Amino acid sequence: MKIAILTLPLHTNYGGLLQAYALQSALERMGYEVSVLDKIRKPKVQIPFSVSVKRLIMKFILRKNVAPIGQLEDYKRRKKRNTNTWKFADKYIHRHELDNLGSIKEDDYDVFVVGSDQIWRREYILNSFKCVEDAFLGFAKTWNVKRIAYAPSFGHDVWDYTPEETVSIRALLRLFDYLSVREESGVELCMRELGLTTKHVADPTMLLTAEDYKVLIKNTSKSSGNLLCYVLDMTEEADLKPELAWVKTTVLVP
């Protein structure tokens, strides 16, 4: 049986990469053939040949300063920054690269699993897919396939979909064979806004053991002794001063 995992595109988000890897691993251990749907990596724009030639002449023959083309330069920066995360994705995640979800055919997969990550956060959907309905398997609404939502997240406890989108989402989710979300607030949103009952389940990263993750780092070089503090949202509640004070008493340097 072939399973496709639909999540947000795999870029620099460590959590996104790990949840995709964990869900893939958990399903493979059950004996399934698993692929993670992912966007082809490329610049957002294609530069016309004539423009490229003109820029090369100005820069290398006429020795003129040439302003960078924003999106291309952004892609180059992202490519450099993403070196290690892309390396992880290419090595450990079975990616099915595609330009858009419309290129998938009904007989490509038997099951579609949506999740985890903030795949149901509206602003992220609009930045990643053609339309809101794609994140709810709108492209496959007439197909004879199994549909599962495992631990997707709305990203917050506010419903920001339009009334028209809400109607479409409700109809699409009613086609699912199993519905679950990552947060309790997601359970409440589904009931209040869609009239649908969902289960509250653990993030896919919790499906693996510590030993599963240790295997991934067994061949890495030893730490230099320094410490990286990664804080998603710095708030008063997330004050790290006590922890940093303790860290400074050790050999670690935050």
Question: What name fits each language-model region?
Answer:
Residues 1-254:
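Active-site anion-handling motifs in enzyme catalytic cores
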